[in-house]
């Protein structure tokens, strides 16, 4: 159990100058919108990109488990185990968004991510995996599962969420992280420059 204050330059919200698990439960997500990444554009974590609320802390928990079939299908290659990371994003003590991420255990070893340091794990998931030579694919759908998925906290009194499903890939197109990010609909904002 870990709580960290995010880097100030990465926070998002009205005051800022910067613009589910595979448990087998039914997925009520519909109306997908795809957002392909452009290699010329810097990418950042969707919670910081799309949540209008200014964030002041992140709580993290993780576990290591054997992968389910759906997780293996997402990675498109075999992995002996996955690191499953839950993150709750807070504003003034209230949880306003939630992310669930899956990483192959081999990646943790290859990149020397110290799992004894939740700070190092959080830094990788929030910032390092979005480095300029990496890219991602994102699909945004409406969901009613945000409060259920966030387990420990209620994100919103409404059951309306925008779910961003994301695969972050390295320069060789290997999937590094598969994530689901839940933001209450009333706090979600997507800006596109075309």
Protein language model features and the residues they cover:
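HTH-adjacent hinge/linker in prokaryotic transcriptional regulators
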Residues: 1-79, 108-118, 122-134, 189-194
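A generic signature of intrinsically disordered, low-complexity regions enriched in glycine/proline
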Residues: 31-35, 42, 90, 163, ...
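A short glycine-rich, His/Asp/Glu-containing loop-to-beta-strand
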Residues: 55-61, 85, 91-101, 183
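C-terminal regulatory/effector modules of DNA-binding transcriptional regulators
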Residues: 70, 76-81, 91-94, 103-194
């Amino acid at each position: 159990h870990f709580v960290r204050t995010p880097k100030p330059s990465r926070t998002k919200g009205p005051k800022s100058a910067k613009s589910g698990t595979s448990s087998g439960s039914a997925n009520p997500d519909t109306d997908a919108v795809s957002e392909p990444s452009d290699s010329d554009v810097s990418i950042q974590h969707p919670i910081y990109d799309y949540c209008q609320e200014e964030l002041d802390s992140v709580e993290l928990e993780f576990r290591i488990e054997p992968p389910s079939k759906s997780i293996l299908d997402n990675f498109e290659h075999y992995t002996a185990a996955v690191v499953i990371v839950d993150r709750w994003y807070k504003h003034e003590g209230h949880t306003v968004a939630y992310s669930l991420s899956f990483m192959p255990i081999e990646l943790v070893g290859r990149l020397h991510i110290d799992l004894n340091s939740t700070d190092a794990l959080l830094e990788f998931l929030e910032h390092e995996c979005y480095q300029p030579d990496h890219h991602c694919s994102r699909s945004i759908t409406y969901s009613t599962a945000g409060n259920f998925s966030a387990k420990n906290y209620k994100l919103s009194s409404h059951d309306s969420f925008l779910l961003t499903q994301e695969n972050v890939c390295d320069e060789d197109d290997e999937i590094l992280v598969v994530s689901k990010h839940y933001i209450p609909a009333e706090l979600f904002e997507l800006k596109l420059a075309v």
